[in-house]
Regions:
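Short Gly/Ser/Thr- and charged-rich N-terminal loops/segments
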Residues: 4, 12-14, 25, 30-32, ...
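Short, low-complexity intrinsically disordered segments enriched in A/P/G/S/L with frequent Arg
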Residues: 9, 18-20, 33-35, 40-41
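Glycine-rich phosphate/pyrophosphate-binding loop regions near the starts of catalytic domains
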Residues: 10, 77-241
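Serine residues within intrinsically disordered or low-complexity segments
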Residues: 13, 19-20, 28, 40, ...
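Glycine-/charge-enriched secondary-structure boundary and capping motifs
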Residues: 57-65, 172-187, 203-210, 262, ...
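N-terminal amphipathic/basic leader segments beginning at the initiator methionine
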Residues: 57-88
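Acidic, glycine-rich loop-and-beta core segments that form the ion-binding/anion-interacting portion
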Residues: 231-271, 275
């Protein structure tokens, strides 16, 4: 132990202190300046530092910046939230090295196929930190993952979260997990595991980041690949709650530039700017299940996230098909009009960055439009007929 300390202190002294102006000269007891061996002085200082460390007592993990007790408290506080998400297929409880989920309930499927997705909330986490509001950002993390796997037709089974933080504040961590649990309840996924990683020195104490991982199941024969898409199919858009979880770097830049306060109330928003921006991402899982239960076969689905319409709608298309979206077929939400106005953002850039009021776009056969719209409304969501599929080069046209 002594050798390790001396070696490390000596290394630090030589590298950090030997070049310091402090050791260019030092005075003898008679007051005259004498040139010294800089490395020798540094080594002597190392010994003094060693004595100081030994006198101060032994080091532990908490002194290094990681509070294990805070971690235990976080787990205790989040247990009640996690319990709300449990499904019969979950095996075991909280605290193990892994989460287990039985697949025996899916024996009726010819070929059960797992579908996975991982995502985060982007820089929307920064907004939550600024507003000191942490109970909804977890919904965003779940939504970003389960909406993605729902585009393949999968039913979400379970979810895992990862929280990185500069310092573990148990109440804040539990608040974040309460949002994750709420997102799991909305999507039907069980929260079977997670990690809270305390990163002293890597992240500021008051900052954190959040990511998630979702796994779902579908019978392989029902997997959505876009191959069933046909010219003549109708595009149905499902309303978003607002900005959702993409484009927040641009959002922050706009309102930093205009020096807008998040507490500013806007009549057109019906709330403050901050509350409009932090509105959690809508989870479409139950509405999509309702459509399936109505006997409708969706031909393709697109989750409108980063990249807006221009990047995401083509992802659901097969070669030889082209999507046409009519911009006046649904109302653009006021938050996007405000963003465009305040930031002087061109319309094409808006549609290439944000969801513009539609968080999910579906393609169905013309004869299934009415049943699809009814099933969506049944779950409290708002649908719009927004366009069509034509024959042509793979891509999207907004008209």
């Amino acid at each position: 132990m002594y050798r390790w300390l001396v070696g490390n202190l000596r290394l630090w002294s030589v590298q950090e202190l030997v070049s310091s102006e402090l050791f260019d000269n030092h005075k003898s007891i008679h007051g005259e300046a004498v040139t010294t061996n800089r490395e020798s002085v540094a080594i002597h200082l190392s010994i003094y530092l060693l004595v100081y460390v030994l006198a101060a007592g032994t080091m532990d993990y908490k002194n290094a910046g990681v509070d294990i007790e805070a971690g235990y408290k976080s787990v205790e506080l989040m247990k009640k939230h996690i319990a709300k998400t449990m499904r019969p297929e979950v095996l075991g409880g909280i605290g193990g090295f892994s989460g287990a989920f039985s697949m025996s309930a899916f024996k009726n499927m010819e070929e059960p196929t797992l579908v996975s997705g991982t995502d985060g909330c982007g820089t929307k986490v920064k907004l939550a930190m600024i507003m000191d509001k942490h109970d909804t950002i977890g919904i965003d993390a779940v939504a970003m993952c389960v909406n993605d796997i729902a585009c393949a037709g999968a039913e979400p089974l379970f979810f895992l979260d990862y929280i990185a933080c500069g310092k573990n504040y148990p109440e804040k961590i539990a608040e974040i997990v309460s949002g994750v649990a709420e997102g799991c309840v909305q999507s039907g996924a069980a929260l079977i595991g997670g990690e809270t990683a305390e990163h002293p020195g890597l992240m500021p104490e008051d900052e954190h980041d959040l990511a998630g991982f979702a796994v779902g199941v579908i019978d392989k024969q029902d997997l959505l690949t876009g191959e069933e898409l046909n010219p003549g199919d109708v595009l149905i858009g499902m309303a978003s709650t607002g900005v959702h979880s993409n484009g927040f770097s641009l959002v922050r830049k706009v309102f930093e530039m205009t020096r807008e306060s998040l507490d500013t109330y806007y009549d057109e928003l019906g709330t403050t700017l901050g509350e409009a921006l932090i509105a959690p991402t809508r989870i479409y899982v139950k509405a999509l299940k309702s459509i399936r239960d109505a006997g409708v076969r969706i031909h393709a689905r697109s989750h409108i996230t980063g990249g807006g319409f221009y990047e995401n709608i083509p992802r659901m298309l097969k070669e030889g098909t082209h999507a046409v979206v009519e911009r006046d077929s649904y109302p653009v939400l006021p938050i996007f009009k405000l963003l465009a106005k305040k930031g002087n953002i061109e319309e094409k850039m808006m549609y290439n960055t944000f969801n513009m009021g539609l968080g999910m776009v579906l393609a169905v056969a013309p004869e299934d439009v009415d049943k699809t719209m009814e099933a969506i409304r049944k779950e409290g969501d708002t649908p719009y007929v927004v366009g069509r599929i034509e024959a042509g080069e793979k891509g999207v046209t907004l008209c």
